[in-house]
């Protein structure tokens, strides 16, 4: 096997060209086998095997800098840079990340995880290179999907004035060369992607400039060339911005890719190389359903079926069913996603109500203001979005939604710890940034049924900005007997005793139950409260608890700073209530990838860690009482 020769960086450069295609096939088999066991991003990685190999063959890494937009397609890059043996621990706690990480390898030039950032980061590296008078290539690889994000165009606009080399590889995995551009552009691509073309171009220009009126002749030729390209060539938009364009190029032809990369190095300025790849290439199940294999858990290689541990509905499933049910009755309900209809559960809505479904692409900022506009026009927009991606639209929430009191519902999926995708995807900041905004209401359900009730409340019984945050994974079906009607700003008493009160937000109620069970065995009196509303905090409930309890324990799966616990402390401080409060929350840090149970333990928000903290604080409360006697 040729793959056995690839054990350290640059081993690929020792291969002969006749070995390239076999290595690509072996890498695909390796990825399918490994990801079938660990889970991960499969379809996108199968699509860029040859592209990645060509980049490593054409450039001198790590001196040359390679940036992967989003970064989920960097698995082949990791294989070629000496990390092949780490794939058994892919995305596991303490194991290899599923994204580029500078602290994992110096071949990873820039950390990524969210979309549309690579051109900005690459341009920054170019400027650093030039100001330090250094000499290396900078290559940003960005997918066609990421080009739906406005940040990419902001960076392209900035890059258009560059006078030094910057290479942008556009990985287009949704189009076919023949279907979209035909034979003439393909022929012109072959011509434009050759050294002889650029030699001729430079020689003709230099000769003409020496002639009387040469400047005028060159300008005329450029205008004629531009008009011709406008009619028959793709990429005209980029060239209108002042960015050179090469392609389209077959992204599965390694030698042709290498040739184009060498041409691109010669261009003084920013250059786009349009590469066409096939998502899921080489594995029939991923080719047929690339969306399913974009991010997938362990699966059966033969059938392509995911090995799910349970068929119970997820929170996303619960949301999907309820919004469709409500939309049947209320035609003003519309749904918005930022390129995540599958993940957020809006696929069913898109089929049932296609005229009321809007996928705006990877454009969270636009999605929020677009939703605000629909709300201003009398509709009831629901923006379904992952917690970590909503961060990108903070200003739009504040400026375009909340200042105007517009009725936009934010359905925030993947709130809290999400696990294997790591720092960039943990949903642990939404409570902090949302509760800082005036006019925003924030709720968190204790189980799947309460999520349904909250969505109905938000759409039918409310008329201002409101967010519902819920976790990834299977919807909790316990505590169904506690189903008091939802009233604005009011918490729900679950179990009322005395001494110690556990006030839990959302899915932390499950942990609160486990903590109470253990503490009851030790003889403690424990109250459990379902916060329901993170903002506003139920101050009546807090007053009630302070009358019969000595210790209030807040519990949330969010960072402490700016979260639910701090709001509770602030209320007691404002009312001069000196009751002891213990905040259980995530630390002021980023949380790496790994199993959620492990991450909770490491972060101190699991059952045993909380019990230890509660007992220590309770001992302090009793000691304080003794000192005051």
Where are these regions (language model features)?
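Long, well-ordered, tryptophan-enriched scaffold segments
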Residues: 174-319
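Cofactor-binding active-site loop characterized by glycine-rich and histidine/acidic residues
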Residues: 41-162, 315, 333, 337-338, ...
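Non-catalytic terminal/interface segments that mediate subunit docking, oligomerization
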Residues: 65, 277-390, 396-406, 487, ...
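A glycine-rich helix N-cap at a beta->alpha junction
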Residues: 86-96, 161-173, 196-199, 402-414
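Structural signature of the thiamine diphosphate
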Residues: 217-285, 407-412, 432-481, 607-629
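Glycine-/acidic-rich phosphate or pyrophosphate-binding loops and their flanking alpha/beta elements
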Residues: 259-262, 294-295, 304, 314-329, ...
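N-terminal amphipathic, basic-rich helices that act as targeting or association modules
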Residues: 1-80, 237-258, 274-277
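Peripheral docking tails and interdomain loops at the edges
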Residues: 298-301, 306-311, 419-421, 441, ...
């Amino acid at each position: 096997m040729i793959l056995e020769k690839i054990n350290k960086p640059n081993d690929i450069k020792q291969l002969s060209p006749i070995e390239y295609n076999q290595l690509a096939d072996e890498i695909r088999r390796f990825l399918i086998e490994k990801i079938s066991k660990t889970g991960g991003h499969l379809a996108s990685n199968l699509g860029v095997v040859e592209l990645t190999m060509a980049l490593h063959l054409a450039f001198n890494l790590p001196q040359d800098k390679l940036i992967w937009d989003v970064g989920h397609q960097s698995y082949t890059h990791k294989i070629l840079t000496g990390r092949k043996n780490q794939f058994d621990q892919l995305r596991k706690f303490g194991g290899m990340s599923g994204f580029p990480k500078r602290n994992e390898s110096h071949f990873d030039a820039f950390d990524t995880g969210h979309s549309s950032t690579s051109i900005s980061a690459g341009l920054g590296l170019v400027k650093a290179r030039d100001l330090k008078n250094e000499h290396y290539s900078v290559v940003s690889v960005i997918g066609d999907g990421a080009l739906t994000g406005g940040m990419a165009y902001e960076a392209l606009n900035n890059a258009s004035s560059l006078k030094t080399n910057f290479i942008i590889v556009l990985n287009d995995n949704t189009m076919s060369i023949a279907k979209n551009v035909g034979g003439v552009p393909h022929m012109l691509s072959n011509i434009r992607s050759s050294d002889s073309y650029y030699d001729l171009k430079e020689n003709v220009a230099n000769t003409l400039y020496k002639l009387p009126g040469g400047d005028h002749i060159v300008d005329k030729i450029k205008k004629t060339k531009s008009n011709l390209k406008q009619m028959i060539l793709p990429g005209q938009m980029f060239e209108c911005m002042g960015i050179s364009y090469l392609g389209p190029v077959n992204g599965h032809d390694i030698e042709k890719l290498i040739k184009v990369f060498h041409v691109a190095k010669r261009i003084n300025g920013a250059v786009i190389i349009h590469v066409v790849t096939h998502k899921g290439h080489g594995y029939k199940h991923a080719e047929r359903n690339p969306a399913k294999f974009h991010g997938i858990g362990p699966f059966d290689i033969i059938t392509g079926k995911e090995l799910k541990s349970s068929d119970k509905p997820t929170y996303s499933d619960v949301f999907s069913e309820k919004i469709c049910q409500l939309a049947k009755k209320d035609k003003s309900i519309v749904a918005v996603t930022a390129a995540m209809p599958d993940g957020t559960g809006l696929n069913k809505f898109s089929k049932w109500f296609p005229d009321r479904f809007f996928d705006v692409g990877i454009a969270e900022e636009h999605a929020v203001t677009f939703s605000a506009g629909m709300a201003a026009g009398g509709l009831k927009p629901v923006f379904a979005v992952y917690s970590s991606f909503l961060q990108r639209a903070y200003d739009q929430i504040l400026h375009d939604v909340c200042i105007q009191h517009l009725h936009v519902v934010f359905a925030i999926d993947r709130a809290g710890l999400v696990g294997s995708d790591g720092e960039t995807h943990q949903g642990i900041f939404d409570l902090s940034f949302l509760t800082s905004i005036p006019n925003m209401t924030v709720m968190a359900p204790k189980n799947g049924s309460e999520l349904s009730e909250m969505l109905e409340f938000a759409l039918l019984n409310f008329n201002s900005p409101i967010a519902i945050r819920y976790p990834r994974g299977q919807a909790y079906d316990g505590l169904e007997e506690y189903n008091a009607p939802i009233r604005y700003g009011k918490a729900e008493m679950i179990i009322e005793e005395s001494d110690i009160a556990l006030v839990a937000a959302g899915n932390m109620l499950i942990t609160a139950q486990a903590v109470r069970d253990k503490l009851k065995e030790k003889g403690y009196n424990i109250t459990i409260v379902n916060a329901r509303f993170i903002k506003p905090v139920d101050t009546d409930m807090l007053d009630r608890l302070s009358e019969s309890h000595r210790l209030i324990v807040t519990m949330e799966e969010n960072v402490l700073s700016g979260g639910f616990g701090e709001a509770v402390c602030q209320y007691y401080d404002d009312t001069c209530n000196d009751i002891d409060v213990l905040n259980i929350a995530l630390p002021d840090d980023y949380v790496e990838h790994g199993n959620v149970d492990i991450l909770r333990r490491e972060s101190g928000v699991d059952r045993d860690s909380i019990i230890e903290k509660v007992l220590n604080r309770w001992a302090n409360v009793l000691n304080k009482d003794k000192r005051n006697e």
